[in-house]
Amino acid sequence: PMDFSVNSAGVATSVNFTNSLKSKSESDITVTSLFVQDQMDLTDNVKIMLGGRLDSFDITVDDIKNGTSESRTDDRFSPRAGLIYKPQENVSLYMSYSESFLPRSGEQFKALSATSARLDPDVFESTELGIKWAMTDTLSFTASIFDSEQTRATYDNDTGENSEIRGLHVDGIELELRGQVSDKLQLAVGYSSLEGTTSSGGVAREVPDHTFSLFAKYQVDENFGWALGVTQQGESHIKDNSTLIL
């Protein structure tokens, strides 16, 4: 049996719940956003969607441990566009493009050095092609292929200039079959395949090669229902360019 009282080296583990927690950094973030989107009918079978989001992202990170503080403000416009073609009433073919960005303070907004504070945010460009097919009144199928690429700024210590490099690249496919089995039971089966590549050509972290999912929803009556879902993921790597598997 597993013994949680000791670690892998056989040393007793303990947690002190009486000491005060010590923060390594504190972040102050202010975000102001404006989002606009419109869909227009070009013909009876063709629709176009245009939109965008304007963000003002202001962040200050205080490094309590080292006694430093860095700030940065990013004002960026992220466009998005889509084209929908309906060859028949129950089938839609679509293509979309969108951009998003992530400040250089990272996903948790907890690290901002003097170098990263002078760099532009990471920009993510995503394109997608897909189909949505209402096979019957109670059965639908969707499929898509997509590609997402990260562009990030880097600082050259020798020249003192910024430049852009290609970062994370992810492409893949997604499939889903959704059906109303009975008046009360709905099922959805999904599958996705992803491939992630780092800027150096290695394998990206936490990108599962295959994912299967099954979700069920049962409506007992108009006031009560339950749902159950199962997801199975294939192999993914612990960190970028690593051979270690989760």
Predicted features, each with a name:
Residues 43-44, 140, 145-149, 164-241:
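Gram-negative outer-membrane beta-barrel transporters
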Residues 25-150, 180-182, 190-195, 217-223:
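Structural signature of Gram-negative outer-membrane beta-barrels, strongest in the C-terminal barrel
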Residues 1-3, 60-67, 105-114, 152-161, ...:
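Outer-membrane beta-barrel translocator domains and adjoining extracellular loop/strand segments
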Residues 1-22, 114-118, 156-164:
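Surface-exposed loop/turn segments flanking beta-strands in extracellular/periplasmic regions
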Residues 7-20, 124-128, 172, 176, ...:
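Short C-terminal domain-edge/linker segments immediately following a structured domain
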Residues 1, 127-129, 213:
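Glycine-rich, charged/polar anion/phosphate-binding loops
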